Amino acid sequence: PKGFYENYDFRIINDRLLNKVGYDAKSYESDIPEPLVSDRIKNAMVKIVQKYDTKYEHWGWKDPRTCLTISQWVTIFTELNLIHKLKIIFVTRRAIAVARSLKTRNDLPLEKGMALWKSYTERVLDFCEHNDFPTFYMSFEGILQSPEDHCEKMFDFLETNFDPTIVKHFVDKKISTSGTGEDAQIPNDISD
C-alpha cells in the first residue's frame, strides 16, 4: 500500500500473454479472453522464473494482470519442478475503490471500472477455488487498518520471520486516495 510495487518484468510478460489473444490491458475492457502461451513467451517466462528463483531464497511478484494469467504461470512452475514453492497471496480491494482509482488515473467511468474489477476477481477466484495451492486472502482495506496484524499473518503463511519494523517502509495509510467505497452504490451484478 505504499506505492504500486508492480514487478515490471512480470508485467511485460503478462501484457505479452494478453496481447497474444488480442487483449490490451490498457483498453480496460471487461471481456477478457483466456491467454495463450507461444514458445517465445514461454521461454521468457521460464527465464524470468529461473532468474528470480536462483537469485532469491524468498521471492514473488505483484502485478494485477496475474489475476488473468495465473494458470499460465502455474504451468511454468510445474514444468520447472518449482510447484512445491508456489504460494498465492490474493489481496482484494473493494470494487468501488478500484473503480474510483481508475477514474482518477485514467478517467474511466465508475461502472466500467467495477466491471473490470469483477472480471479480474472472478478469474483469479475461480482459479483458486479449483486448485489446491496454498492461498492467503487479505484485503487492501484490512492492511491499511491494521498493517502489523495483517503482515504478521502473511509472514506466518509464508513461514518466514516477521520484523514489524518493515511495515512502516511499505504501508502508508495516506496512499489510498480512492477511499474504501463504503458510501457507494454498487450495481447488483458486481455485488452479488
Predicted segment positions?
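PAPS-dependent sulfotransferase catalytic core
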Residues: P1-N43, V171-G179
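Alpha-helical elements of Rossmann-like donor-binding domains used by nucleotide-donor carbohydrate transfer enzymes
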Residues: A44, Q72, S119, R123, ...
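A structural motif corresponding to the C-terminal end of an alpha-helix
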Residues: Q50-E57, R123-F136
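Lumenal/extracellular "mature" regions of secretory-pathway glycan-modifying transferases
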Residues: T104-S119
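Catalytic phosphate/metal-binding cores of nucleic-acid and nucleotide-processing enzymes, i.e., regions
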Residues: E57, A95-V98, E111, V124
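Conserved phosphate-donor/acceptor-positioning beta-strand/loop module used by diverse small-molecule
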Residues: K62-T66, N81-K103, W117
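The conserved 3'-phosphoadenosine-5'-phosphosulfate
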Residues: P1-Y5, F90-I96, R100, E129-S191
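Glycine-rich phosphate-binding loop used to anchor ATP phosphates in small-molecule kinases
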Residues: V37-T75
